[in-house]
């Protein structure tokens, strides 16, 4: 099933799945980068469960955490990697790009952008995108590094973005892990 809810539409036009092959020819190196940063503020909902959207919002606003992510981006950039940075929030994409600075080839890939702007961003060495827009249907075979800048439980589609590579670098996934107990397993 597709996360975007279009499974029924595709099945209607194309019919049932005949065969499902999991492609295991390329396996990325996966690293967890532990920030040691706890969210400043947590809230619970009426039912007593943790308010995850608020928590993710607080993490994305953390200046110290964002500087740490940008430090990783700069390190991988210096290794001649083509980097996709995924996050849950549009504002986070914009803040990270601003912190990275103009000395680096970077672009934004978020919803509501015109096609020409998206295509231009897709040519950059660092692409900041939301999970939503880059999850299904996004293709850039030159990518070799994925940085998961905000917590996400299902990243299979996201990791697939760097497994279609056309360059010499091995695929690399860097998961930014925060020490808050709920987020460690995401």
Label each region the model flagged:
Residues 1, 91, 178-182:
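Short histidine/acidic/glycine/proline-rich micro-motifs that form metal-
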Residues 4-7, 66-70, 140, 152-156:
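Amphipathic alpha-helical transducer elements in NTP-driven molecular machines
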Residues 44-88, 94-99:
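Conserved interdomain hinge at the start of the Helicase C-terminal
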Residues 105-107, 111-186:
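Conserved RecA-like P-loop NTPase helicase motor core
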């Amino acid at each position: 099933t597709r996360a975007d809810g279009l499974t029924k539409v595709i099945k209607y036009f194309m019919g049932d799945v005949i065969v499902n092959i999991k492609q295991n020819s390329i396996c990325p190196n996966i690293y967890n980068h532990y920030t040691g940063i706890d969210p400043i503020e947590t809230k619970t909902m009426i039912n007593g469960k943790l308010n995850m959207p608020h928590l993710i919002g607080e993490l994305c606003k953390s200046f110290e955490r964002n500087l740490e992510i940008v430090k990783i981006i700069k390190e991988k950039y210096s290794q001649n990697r083509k980097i996709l940075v995924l996050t849950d929030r549009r504002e986070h994409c914009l803040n990270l790009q601003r912190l990275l600075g103009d000395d680096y080839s970077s672009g934004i890939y978020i919803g509501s952008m015109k096609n020409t702007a998206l295509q231009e961003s897709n040519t950059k060495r660092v692409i900041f995108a939301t999970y939503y827009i880059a999850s299904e249907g996004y293709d850039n075979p030159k990518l070799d590094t994925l940085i998961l800048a905000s917590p996400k439980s299902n990243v299979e589609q996201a990791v697939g973005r760097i497994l279609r590579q056309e360059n010499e670098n091995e695929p690399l996934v860097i998961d930014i892990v925060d020490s808050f107990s709920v987020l460690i397993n995401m």
